[in-house]
């Protein structure tokens, strides 16, 4: 490999490294905007988009997208969710449980961990729900 080839290779590797660093910066910036917790008293409604995504609609108009860290198998948009909080907050370390409708009552189903709460607009939330239908 001659000196020119080494220089070109270093430039290519440098560009790739810079691109990866920029992508990491973008991800960190999005996470900086995200909230670890929301107040339980402020939760007005929870929409299930799919087995990996929830939409939290808050009193006061805020809307958050919660990307679950792992797929929640069997969770459907028509399901009802249950959660418990001893501190008045619902956080990214907490768990939601799908309530199974047995016709004569509900029984706990699968439980799944929450992710970070990413602020989004109501319009984006509505578009996500429509796209998932």
Where are these predicted regions, by residue range?
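Positively charged n-region of N-terminal signal peptides that target proteins for export
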Residues: 1-5
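Short, functionally important structural connectors and interaction interfaces within domains
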Residues: 7, 29-30, 35-38, 104, ...
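Bacterial N-terminal signal peptides
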Residues: 7-17
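Sec/Tat signal peptide C-region and signal peptidase I cleavage site
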Residues: 17-23
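N-terminal secretory signal peptides
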Residues: 23-78
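Helix-rich interaction surfaces within compact, conserved domain-sized segments
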Residues: 70-133
């Amino acid at each position: 490999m001659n000196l020119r080839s080494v220089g070109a290779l270093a430039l290519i590797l440098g560009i790739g490294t810079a691109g990866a660093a920029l992508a990491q910066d973008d991800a960190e910036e999005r996470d900086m905007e995200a909230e670890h917790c929301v107040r339980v008293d402020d939760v007005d409604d929870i929409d299930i988009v799919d087995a990996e995504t929830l939409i939290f609609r808050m009193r006061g108009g805020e809307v958050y997208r919660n990307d679950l860290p792992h797929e929640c198998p069997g969770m459907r948009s028509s399901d009802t969710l249950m959660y418990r909080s001893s501190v008045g907050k619902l956080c990214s370390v907490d768990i939601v449980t799908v309530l199974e409708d047995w016709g004569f009552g509900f029984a706990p189903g699968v439980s799944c961990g929450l992710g970070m709460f990413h602020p989004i607009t109501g319009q984006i939330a509505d578009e996500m729900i429509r796209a998932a239908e």
